[in-house]
Amino acid sequence: MSFVPGQENAGSRSSSGSRSGNGILKKTTWADQTERAGNNGNRGRRNQPKQTATTQPNSGSVVPHYSWFSGITQFQKGKEFQFVQGQGVPIANGIPASEQKGYWYRHNRRSFKTPDGQQKQLLPRWYFYYLGTGPHAGAEYGDDIEGVVWVASQQADTKTTADIVERDPSSHEAIPTRFAPGTVLPQGFYVEGSGRSAPASRSGSRSQSRGPNNRARSSSNQRQPASTVKPDMAEEIAALVLAKLGKDAGQPKQVTKQSAKEVRQKILNKPRQKRTPNKQCPVQQCFGKRGPNQNFGGSEMLKLGTSDPQFPILAELAPTAGAFFFGSKLELVKKNSGGADEPTKDVYELQYSGAVRFDSTLPGFETIMKVLNENLNAYQKDGGADVVSPKPQRKGRRQAQEKKDEVDNVSVAKPKSSVQRNVSRELTPEDRSLLAQILDDGVVPDGLEDDSNV
């Protein structure tokens, strides 16, 4: 007796359905009704089976066999399709463990043309066939065949073929692929129809057409879909948290003078060996001016610190904590404590010396050499230990300063005395009247305006 996947007993009856030509009770589905309605317009022509992915031609290669199960599609390049031994056979009602043996067949799908005119090949899809069926029905289990992966359960006898009938698409629909609990699906692949498949949506539409009691009962019996994690779910969660805290995730954080001062003070409060210089706390504030003992850093890198775009590639040369302690020469030196008026305390220095070795095979070697040459002993090239240029003044302030300098350079005459200021002013009518009495002729000329004409 041949087994039919998806059927517990070939002789069982159902409350609704119709018998096919081979005597097997076939469940009537919405898809069957659609096909039957379409066949009424064929005017006696022979029914043609609907093509599926396994029968569509691709570069002249046709697979004239229907799998009992939905396919597994690859969505990541470079991933290998394989299962752990004893796993990989889809489960179906009515198939005993002894018949769970077969192979996965790789179907190379068609290519398509992209908008820029290039041909892009779709990643392959895999279909399962029981041993003794499908495109390699004559092959023995374990034969080395390109595009074939053999799978079998632990109880299956792989020396004999499986007693499974071929699927007739006009009588049986493909079964959604499911595996036994504990099966590890190959990475980079997904099962077709594992989400909201067409059968699920059809069953939902049928349940809605029933009464309210039946609909409530069927909805309670339906399995709830598994929660899925979207790629951008982490960003959504972060945005919700920020919104809860009253912050806008899309708005860039503005650095004010107060916040920069707080950042700088926070860095300077750390021990010297734990400080990380940046824009708010430049290198020289963290570690002092450049000189013979601290000879690294050009003007730009001293301003930006670790925020400099060239710094990350230099950080590749920095030793790890393990390399620092175990790959360096260390010496513990006690230093003198503070002055006489300072409290007595023991001060030590852990002095170290070592080397970082690299060669031209290091990724980014040329860039590293360029950055090193620009920043090593840069204080000597820039004319002093302090290579940071003074902060430029604003244009308005600079112009005001220039005007002030011009005023300072111009020699200004001393102010006149009060007598001189009074003489230079014009005579009023009262002044003219008074002068007329003084003068003999009693007339004051019109041009008389100062004491020089008197």
Curated annotation (Swiss-Prot):
Cystines in this chain: none
Molecular function per GO: RNA binding
Keyword flag Transcription: yes
Annotated signal peptide: none
Sequence ranges of Low complexity compositional bias: 11-21, 193-212
Residue stretches spanning the membrane: none
Protein name: Nucleoprotein
Record text on subunit structure and interactions: Homooligomer. Both monomeric and oligomeric forms interact with RNA. Interacts with protein M. Interacts with NSP3; this interaction serves to tether the genome to the newly translated replicase-transcriptase complex at a very early stage of infection.
Annotated spans, RNA-binding: 56-197
Domain named CoV N CTD: residues: 260-383
Source taxon at top rank: Viruses
Disordered: annotated span: 1-62, 159-230, 249-292, 382-428
Spans annotated as Dimerization: 267-383
Polar residues bias (residue ranges): 49-61, 215-227
Bias type Basic residues, positions: 267-277
